[in-house]
From Swiss-Prot:
GO terms for cellular component: plasma membrane. It comes from the Bacteria. Residues 64-268, 357-551 form the ABC transmembrane type-1 domain. InterPro entries: MetI-like (IPR000515), MetI-like_sf (IPR035906). Probably part of the binding-protein-dependent transport system y4fNOP. Probably responsible for the translocation of the substrate across the membrane. This is Probable ABC transporter permease protein y4fN. PANTHER family: INNER MEMBRANE ABC TRANSPORTER PERMEASE PROTEIN YDCV. It comes from Sinorhizobium fredii (strain NBRC 101917 / NGR234). Belongs to the binding-protein-dependent transport system permease family. CysTW subfamily. It holds the Pfam family BPD_transp_1. Disulfide bonds: none annotated. The chain crosses the membrane at residues 10-30, 68-88, 98-118, 121-141, 145-165, 196-216, 247-267, 304-324, 363-383, 395-415, 426-446, 480-500, 534-554. The keyword Nucleus does not apply. GO terms for biological process: transmembrane transport. The lineage of its organism: Bacteria, Pseudomonadati, Pseudomonadota, Alphaproteobacteria, Hyphomicrobiales.
């Protein structure tokens, strides 16, 4: 055995040991700790006692009812708006289709805590729209938007990204010749939509509806920012219980929510697979846009489409404009009367406003670098070798995608709130590093999924040719494999970096005064009455939107598209 081969084996086993330790310490142990906290107390089964305490709590019962009806209402309103968007973009001929497509795609760059803060700035007590309405209706309360209505409104217009991406793709698989055949037989437009188009796209509609339901049920940022004092959902109660030092009740509530969400995820995957099978290769004639012959219907559809476009674009435009406005104009002016770079100078100038931006940039960079290193080491092994170890790693890497973020966060808190021998008897809770560790775990599923596809797509002849010329394993990886997967790695790194900048649920559970990230600063600014803090928050939101747009443009350039995550609304 040559020296290089021995070194390869040493690095191989050393890397596997490190990854196995990381998976055990920061994924499996926290999950077991969360289960133990939910089910046991002082060594005995206490789940039923915790359930009884939760059931007796009026706030928990109210949050449960709010979650149930808000989830149902959101699913209904998002389905109506989303299907209308798809019909306007992919079925009917409406003027300005390109502009409407841009407007309807804004949830891809304007989601989660960024969008919740943006809607609060637009329609909240200090919002520009509220200022305009107050001038017209002086008796209008400044907090008219805060409460269940604001949450439902935000959900409705921020959760249509699944329809925009998946349902539009399903519409393109409809065979236009079947529509023409039905039309030639005298079928009306509504009959064609109901009897020809809908059966083809129905599995995708069901999958998208379930994804919307999952997102609405786990909504966190929207009720936190827009719900006010009287409207709370279960995700907020988990955070509240944890802050009250009741990790047992927090873990149990997160576990119950997780079980429901996992069941819905399995259902959505079933319908997604059925949709892919049903509409697989049927479309021989691409669907053509249909003109709306009835003049009144054409006017109504066009007006509704542009009204939706205005609703989507208004918060984005106002945020960008007011991020360049003096802080004194926020909450007073409908549109800024002057512009300044002072807000950006405060954020980027190295003062107190720069700290959350720096913290998020640093922690996101660390998380992406560590996650990418783990992925680039583990995925080639998982692709080449199929044994119990690689299958186990594969399952572990998918777990953070299935397990709700709140349950993962509670598990990390419970596992590391005391000296833990797996990390040298350190107490990580309250330290700088627990949040970056959570970011790494949160990032792994998407990284593994995309990089696996990239490695599977490599022609084995390249590696075999390098091996035949005597190249060692590390040399082949560095000079042959990595250049081939580099575009995907760059895209995935950019996507996760952008997601982590706006990751609110995990940050809300794990941050401390030493590493306060951007999402927490954005929420603080959104609910603050201080115009200076609100102005800084607008700069944060604008910078995150700029990063999101840059990632999408890179994705377009690399022709790899973009896959959406839970908006964590």
């Amino acid at each position: 055995m040559s020296r290089s081969t021995r070194l390869d084996r040493v690095f191989y086993w050393l890397g596997l040991i490190v990854i196995a330790w990381a998976v055990l310490t920061f994924l499996l142990v926290p999950m077991l700790a969360a289960l133990q906290a939910a089910l046991f107390r002082l060594g005995s089964l206490a789940m039923f006692d915790a359930v009884s305490e939760l059931a007796r709590s009026r706030r928990v019962r109210a949050a449960l009812w709010n979650t149930v009806w808000m989830t149902a209402a959101t699913t209904l309103t998002v389905t109506i708006v989303g299907m209308f968007q798809v019909a306007v973009l992919e079925y009917f001929r409406v003027p300005g289709r390109g502009f409407l497509k841009i407007a309807f795609s804004t949830p891809l760059v304007f989601g989660g805590v960024v969008a919740a803060a943006g809607y609060n700035f637009t329609y909240g007590p200090s919002g520009a729209i509220t200022a305009a309405l107050a001038a017209l209706f002086p008796s209008l309360p400044r907090d008219w938007f805060i409460g269940w209505f604001g949450v439902l409104f935000a959900h409705t217009f921020l959760m249509t990204s699944f329809h925009f991406l998946f349902l539009r793709a399903a519409m393109r698989r409809v065979d236009y010749s079947t529509i023409e055949a039905a039309r030639s037989m005298g079928a009306s437009e509504m009959t064609i939509l109901r009897c020809v188009v809908l059966p083809v796209i129905l599995p995708t509609v069901l999958a998208v509806t379930l994804l919307t339901l999952i997102t609405a049920m786990g909504s966190f940022a929207a009720p936190q920012v827009l719900g006010g004092r009287d409207f709370h959902m279960l995700s907020q109660m988990v955070l509240t219980l944890n802050s009250l030092r009741r990790p047992d009740m927090a873990a149990l509530l997160a576990l119950l929510m997780g079980l429901v969400l996992m069941g819905l995820i399995l259902l959505s995957q079933y319908f997604e697979a059925k949709g892919a099978y049903t509409a697989g290769a049927k479309a021989t004639t691409r669907i053509q846009l249909r003109a709306i012959r009835n003049p009144l219907a054409r006017i109504v559809v066009t007006a509704l489409a542009y009204l939706l476009a205005a609703i989507y674009l208004m918060p984005v435009a106002l945020i960008v404009l007011f991020s360049f406005a003096p802080a004194s104009s926020i909450g007073i002016d409908v549109l800024p009367s002057s512009f300044t770079l002072a807000n950006y100078a405060r954020v980027l100038g190295g003062g107190a406003a720069f700290v959350p931006f720096f913290n998020s940039m640093l922690m996101s960079s660390i998380a992406v670098a560590v996650g990418l290193a783990i992925t680039l080491f583990a995925v080639p092994i998982m692709v080449r070798k199929r044994n119990w170890l690689t299958r186990g790693l594969d399952i572990c890497f998918v777990l953070p995608w299935i397990i709700p973020t709140m349950l993962l966060a509670v598990g990390l808190i419970v596992a590391f709130d005391a000296p833990n021998p797996l990390v040298g008897n350190l107490v990580l809770l309250g330290s700088y590093w627990l949040l970056p560790i959570g970011y790494v775990i949160f990032s792994l599923p998407l990284m593994v999924r995309f990089m696996r596809s990239a490695f599977i797509g490599i022609d084995p002849a390249f590696d075999e040719a390098a091996r035949a010329m005597g190249a060692s394993g590390p040399y082949r990886l560095r000079r042959v494999v990595l250049p081939l997967v580099a575009p995907t790695a760059i895209l995935v790194a950019g996507m996760k970096f952008n997601n982590l900048l706006a990751e609110y649920p995990l940050s809300a559970f794990l941050y401390n005064v030493n590493n306060k990230p951007l999402p927490i600063a954005i929420v603080d600014g959104a609910v603050s009455a201080d115009p200076d803090q609100a102005a800084v928050s607008l700069v944060y939101v604008t910078l995150i939107m700029a990063f999101s747009l840059a990632v999408i443009l890179i994705a377009e350039r690399l022709s790899l598209g973009r896959t959406p995550e839970s908006s964590n609304l």
